[in-house]
Amino acid sequence: MTRSDLAAAFDDGPALVSYVVAGDPTPAATAEYIDALVDGGTDVIELGLPFSEPVAEGTTIQNAIKRALDAGMTPDAYLDLVARIDADVPVVCMTYYNLLFQYGDRAGPAAFVSAAAEAGVSGFVVPDLPVDESGPLREACRAHGLDLVFVVAPTTTADRRERMLDLTTGFVYVQGRVGTTGAREEVSAATPDALAALQHTDIPKAVGFGVSSGEQAREITASGADGVIVGSAYVDTVADGVADDDPPSVVADRLRDLAAELKAGAARGVPEPEHK
């Protein structure tokens, strides 16, 4: 598998997509955390590019973004970090369209997409990008062989959902609940119905928003998901380490253990094949 082959990350069973904020609390720490998450079983890294108005995020990730911005994280520093990642897994850039549009000396997303492709990014998740206005970013991604992952929410209409399924590449991001990101104690009751509405498509389906434990990961894959997306649980772990002044190596060990729990839980949700 090459780093640009995002869909292939789902080929060998349920995929674990792990989100962290680039530069929280430092770029060096983020690189160490990514290595730990991959060691723990992560199949795809969703690396957040900090933006000052993260409308889809809850308090946990908003605070992480502020820490990263206060520490000096910029789009160029983000690309430098991606280029230094050694892990042989796809890296997806999660950010907001304004950053992509304003990068470089001309309006439009093409300049950042080109730079991201050179750095090693495999695709994008842009939650504030309306599907009907996604043409320029889709064209830029297609030109560089990158995926553009659309987010299907519980409130997405059937017509718009089908449009997203036609255009998404790599996988489809299934928003497991209404609202913003943040760890929850229970899987939303709406998740099985959301997945059932997508079973007619072959594109891998990964559920995010609120996943924080191995048991939740099991429930989600048992409901038909091809993967789980986890963010706030990791970011909470990083925040606790920052608050306690723990060295990055200690935080990395905790992240590795959490990823291993989540990966194992996701695998338990899929029935083992029958042996004849």
Swiss-Prot record:
**Domain of life of the source:** Archaea
GO cellular component terms, semicolon-separated: cytosol
Listed EC numbers: 4.2.1.20
Q: In which pathway does it act?
A: Amino-acid biosynthesis; L-tryptophan biosynthesis; L-tryptophan from chorismate: step 5/5
Q: What reaction gets catalysed by this protein?
A: (1S,2R)-1-C-(indol-3-yl)glycerol 3-phosphate + L-serine = D-glyceraldehyde 3-phosphate + L-tryptophan + H2O
**Alphabetical list of PROSITE patterns matching this protein:** TRP_SYNTHASE_ALPHA (PS00167)
One Gene Ontology MF term: tryptophan synthase activity
> Gene3D superfamilies, alphabetically?
Aldolase class I
Q: Which GO terms describe its biological process?
A: L-tryptophan biosynthetic process
What CDD domains does the annotation carry? Tryptophan_synthase_alpha (cd04724)
Q: What does this protein do?
A: The alpha subunit is responsible for the aldol cleavage of indoleglycerol phosphate to indole and glyceraldehyde 3-phosphate.
> Which family does the UniProt entry place this protein in?
Belongs to the TrpA family.
Q: Can you state the subunit structure given in the record? A: Tetramer of two alpha and two beta chains.
Q: Which HAMAP family match?
A: Trp_synth_alpha
Could you identify this protein by its name?
Tryptophan synthase alpha chain
Please report the organism this UniProt entry assigns to the protein: Halobacterium salinarum (strain ATCC 700922 / JCM 11081 / NRC-1)
